[in-house]
A protein has these predicted regions:
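Short, solvent-exposed loop/hinge segments that bridge or flank secondary-structure elements
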Residues: 1-57, 95-108
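Calycin-type beta-barrel ligand-binding domains and close structural analogs
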Residues: 42-165
């Protein structure tokens, strides 16, 4: 309530919730939001539960909720996505399916307490945010070794960025 005051707290909650609590993405979201509005789905897709980034080997790997490895590939930088300034990476493995491309926001756990990213098999479609198979989807994650302070800082930053001024 420090940012918006007690009288505006409920409206602020509704605004913030409506931005990131979408439960559809892709063509389903395009249809659902055809008359306006729209909330981003910020979860993981394709059974992904945990991501690991290894900077030493330029490898990104992912596991499902049971710890089973879904993929593990080396990636190389291919450019910058112009709409949101995401760093674009492509797998060195030609058979990477929906994990062929990773587009990573410049967020870091040290500075923003979370990361934002997209992944998929079509780089052009990943560059579009309100059309196509990845519409209204931007995954967000927090470190698996986070503590309560990091969680609180992440929430505070989200509120400040989206409610201030």
């Amino acid at each position: 309530t420090a940012l918006v005051g007690e009288d505006n707290a409920e409206a602020a909650f509704e605004k913030l919730s409506s931005m990131v609590t979408g439960d559809v993405y892709g063509e389903d979201a395009v249809k659902a939001y055809a008359n306006g509005g729209g909330a981003y789905f910020c979860g993981f897709t394709n059974s992904l539960a945990t991501l690991t980034f290894d900077g030493e080997t330029s490898t990104i790997s992912g596991t499902d909720k049971d710890g089973n490895v879904l993929f593990s590939h080396a990636y190389h930088y291919i450019g910058m996505e112009p709409v949101r300034g995401l760093y674009e990476f492509e797998s060195d493995d030609a058979d990477s399916g929906e994990f062929t491309y990773f587009f990573l926001a410049p967020d870091t756990s040290a500075e923003t307490y979370h990361i934002e990213f997209r992944y998929g098999s079509d780089a052009e479609a990943l560059s579009q945010y309100d059309v196509g198979e990845y519409a209204y989807w931007l995954a967000s994650g927090i470190s698996t070794d986070c503590d309560q302070t990091m969680i609180d800082n992440c929430i505070e930053l989200f509120c400040t960025e989206n409610l201030a001024g």
